[in-house]
Amino acid sequence: MKLNRLFILCAAMLVGVLAQSCCNSGISGENYKFENGMIVFDEPARAAGQESMLGFAAEPIPVVRVGFVGLGQRGPGAVNRFTHIEGVEIKGLCDIEQSNVDKCQKMLKNAGMPEAGSYVGPEAYKELCERDDVDLIYIATDWIHHVPIALYAMEHGKHVAIEVPAAVSVEECWQLVDTSERTRRHCMMLENCVYDFFELTCMNMAHQGVFGEILHAEGAYIHNLSDYWDSYHSNWRLDFNQKHRGDVYATHGFGPVCLALNIHRGNKLNYLVCMDTKSVNGLEKAAAKMGSTEFANGDHTSTLLKTENGQTIEIQHNVYTPRPYNRLYQLTGSKGFANKYPVTGFTFTEGMLKDGVIPEGATLNPHGFASKEIEEAAMAAYKHPIHQEIEEKAKTVGGHGGMDFVMDYRLIYCLQNGLPLDQDVYDAAEWSCIGELSAVSAKHNSMPVAVPDFTRGDWNKLDGVKFHTK
């Protein structure tokens, strides 16, 4: 008996030693390894024949010919918005349901536009991508089909715009980057929140130094989806969340703060840690709708990141509990502060704003929000040039208050004029990879996970974010 106990004890010690050795030596059975207390994902070298897409501008396309794939929830709104953009031809409409295609054909008819080609079925997108009279494929399917469709489109010479998240794994992020670099085709993720009026104005303020040096930023997607789960075809979104841990929908909160911090434009994401709660409401919903007995996604997930330039970022995900809608969007600077949710407001320091923004005799409170009068004056004084150009029409056309139209308008404007896009393939990869990275951190007791450098060392070659105009 004593011998057996001794054998078991020695075996346990050996397992522990081997596990520690694996962590120190970088051995892992996954697509990542453990190095010096950090989880590090594989970063493939750039293949021969590939070139960076930083600052890439394609040849101008005066009339952009578009094919839409995915017409269930987000797709129809995009089709409608495109009918309000000049210099666009809608060549194809694709979905797995004929009724969704028919609905969008009616939109074209009502707008006085020609009927587009109809493509119905799970593989029908391939025929659309193979057409020689299409320049751009606009993808708004369920998440797991984003990358396969985007890769096929780029391989057939098409630029692609992909709904969020662009990819659902680190491997898929690299596939988008490599295919875009090799085919020299734009790959833009359709992150609409970077174009919202408060976010874009605050980005402009941050880049002009109004807040001093940005030290900390926050973003989130907090949206109780209890009234929406039934609207997803075949429960695809609940099914995805049931299978995946981590922040699976980070980009709405994360993208805007990344642009404010000039990520891969003189700054980069270094590592993250993630912690999540157990699943209560998610499991309850999945049990009722799908008979699930387990649910991987925590009801609330929190992720912290550190940047190369010494800033921290916090992002949160919660689509299960009864809370007011909230994307946070918060910038903490050495000389100021901006906050969007749940209360919009600014804190400014004397001497940091343009002359005339602060009314004569007004004072600034370093312990509270500036007055609404000062807030409105600052929003007007630092309105982004893009909004100065298109805000009125955007609010008329709509799409989440107009930001969706600004996004689509800018995409087409840049393609028409042969300009670099506002969001490039590296944004798509950096913002989307948070899903798997956060899941792996949570799985390993909130262990730090290195964020891959999808630019392969070129993160400091561009000097800040720039929205190009002709």
Regions found by a protein language model. Give the residues of each.
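N-terminal Rossmann-like dinucleotide-binding module
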Residues: C23-A111
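Predominantly a Rossmann-like dinucleotide-binding segment in NAD(P)-dependent oxidoreductases
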Residues: T183-M188, C193-A296
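C-terminal motif of bacterial Sec signal peptides marking the signal peptidase cleavage site
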Residues: L18-S21
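C-terminal helical cap and adjacent loop that interface with cofactors, partners, or active-site loops
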Residues: G26-A48, L54, P76-G77, C258, ...
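Bacterial N-terminal signal peptides that target proteins for export
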Residues: M1-I8
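Glycine-rich phosphate/pyrophosphate-binding beta-alpha loops
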Residues: Q316-N326
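Beta-strand-loop-alpha-helix segment that lines the small-molecule cofactor/substrate pocket
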Residues: L136, D142-W143, V147-Y195, G209
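A structured beta-alpha segment of the ubiquitous adenosine-cofactor-binding alpha/beta core
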Residues: A116-I139
